[in-house]
Amino acid sequence: AGQNLHVVEGDICDAALLDKAFHGCNYDAVVHLAARVGVRPSREHPDLYLRTNIDGTFRLLEAVKKAGTPRLIFASSSSVYGLNKKLPFSELDRIDQTISPYAATKLAGEQLCSTYAHLYSIRTVCLRFFTVYGPRQRPDLAISKFTRLINEDQPIPKFGDGSSARDYTYVDDIIEGIVAALAYDGPIFDVFNLGGSQTTTLAELIALVEKALGKRAEINQLPEQPGDLPRTYADVAKAGELLGYSPAIPIAEGVPKYVNWYLEYMAMGAGGN
């Protein structure tokens, strides 16, 4: 770590640790990325998701309030749109039909952030991320899982008929959006979508990974999973107008970039993702 970086490892539900992390520091802003993530595991361990994503966010907001930190960025999720059938998803669309514990906790996090923003004048931006991918991404996500399994000549799980679609967003574009949000001086509380603004079906994604690896996938066909949205698609017009956000890396470019990184990472003997 450099002289301007101090790393504190711990649990955001630990109020004492948060007090220590904020003690004597006049932070310009807090970017809250800490969370338990993933729709499917949230069905198996909803208690852990409620603890981290709701109680943890509450405790962090308390620490921000006590420290007088003027600005907060909260990483939310496209999953809050739930059963919304209108495409693309707009920040003005209904968000009262979440279909997973994970989505419910992210929506609760947004509401907590709104409350603290208005009560304590913490300028807050909630960013709804759409399926972020790229180097060092979570190993349970489709792109990293498919890359590893196809590369190792193992079957990949394919849920449903392959028509489900996601708006995949390369991590570099997400970072650009976060940096822009840190400089945003709009309302005391606001919400933006950050996505790639294009949809890719599961079948198309598998084909992209196959092409990047130069290998065909062996398919383990499985039924659709409850809680998974059939399609996500970000309307990023608001972020474009007010943040200058413009996703630059389409999925056809991003998947090969990720696969190349993965192969180089494995060649260094790193093992896993």
Indicate where each model-derived feature is located.
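A short C-terminal helix-loop "cap" of Rossmann-like NAD(P)-dependent dehydrogenase/epimerase domains
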Residues: A1-Q3, E91-I95, Y120-R123, T147-K158, ...
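N-terminal Rossmann-like NAD(P)+-binding domain of SDR-like oxidoreductases, especially those catalyzing
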Residues: A1-V132, Y245, I249, W261, ...
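Conserved mid-core alpha-helix of short-chain dehydrogenase/reductase
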Residues: L17, F58-A63, Y168, D173-A180
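Glycine/proline-rich active-site loop of Rossmann-fold NAD(P)-dependent oxidoreductases
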Residues: L107, V132-K145, E152-F159, S163, ...
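Hydrophobic alpha-helix immediately C-terminal to the catalytic Tyr-X-X-X-Lys motif of short-chain
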Residues: A108, L112, Y116, F146, ...
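Hydrophobic "lid"/C-terminal helical patch
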Residues: I150, I178-L182, I206-V209, V236, ...
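Conserved C-terminal active-site "lid" loop/helix of NAD(P)H-dependent oxidoreductases
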Residues: V171, V191, A203, L222-P250, ...
